[in-house]
Amino acid sequence: MICVCHRCTFLGALKVGTTKARGEAHAVGAPPAARDAALPDTPAALATEAFLAAVSNVTMIRHCIRTYRFGRLLAEKAGAKPDLEVLYVASLLHDLGLETLFDGPEDFEQLGARAAKRFLSDEGHWHLADPVAAAIEIHTQLETANDPRPEVAYLAIGALCDVTGARLDQFAPRVIQEIVAEYPREGTKDLIVALIARQIAIKPQSNIARIASRVDVAAAVRNAPFAG
């Protein structure tokens, strides 16, 4: 069992005012981003945070949380109702296959899905293992945005929003500023470009390499309307 104090350590490392965010989450008149600031705190969510903190770095973890924040807000705007626990856990683990510990000869999406399923199953969170793995495995495919499963669709949409700025025009500038201030972007573009370049170099037949053969992925990341 992961106690809530682990979340304070986890978010504290990201320089997030957890107590303030939680206090404002349901405050009357709180701005949209503040109301959305409360992250799922189920046992599975807390266990996943602790796991990710042990295997990843701050820049990647911030990207994962922003993926959830953008995905959740975009789902809300569209009237979609994803299971927030599934969406959050999938967001935290969606790039697990890019971590050296979990990398291998297969596509990083497949490796990440498998590692996420194994972790969740080993922790006893069987109800999440399959839906989280399903979302992770196809999160880089453009058609996934139209998937009828909202958790699958909005993981892909949230990740693309944070990486390239897609659909960012649906947000008021202050909402974007609040999310980025809470989970800073320093080093995000450099990290993602480097990780993708590595995947293409060592796996020229991979899914991400095929995408890069059609789209200048590095330019799309670099040109995203974010400072970092």
Name each model-derived stretch.
Residues A38-A44, P82-S91:
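Short coil-to-beta-strand
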Residues H63, A80-V86, E123-I136:
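Acidic/histidine metal-binding catalytic segments
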Residues M1-R35, A53, N57-A80, G124, ...:
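Divalent metal-dependent phosphate-bond-processing catalytic cores, especially two-metal-ion Mg2+/Mn2+ enzymes
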Residues T67-R69, D107-D122:
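An active-site-proximal "capping" alpha-helix that borders the catalytic cofactor pocket
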Residues E76, G97-L101, K117-H125, I138-A145:
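Short helix-capping and hinge/turn segments at secondary-structure transitions, especially at repeat
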Residues L84-F102, F108, G112, A133-L142:
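His-Asp-centered metal-binding catalytic motifs of divalent-metal-dependent phosphohydrolases/nucleases
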Residues P31-A33, A45-T48:
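Glycine-rich, flexible beta-strand/loop modules in the N-terminal catalytic cores of phosphate-handling
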Residues S56-I65, T100-L111, W126:
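Active-site metal-coordination segments of metallo-dependent hydrolases
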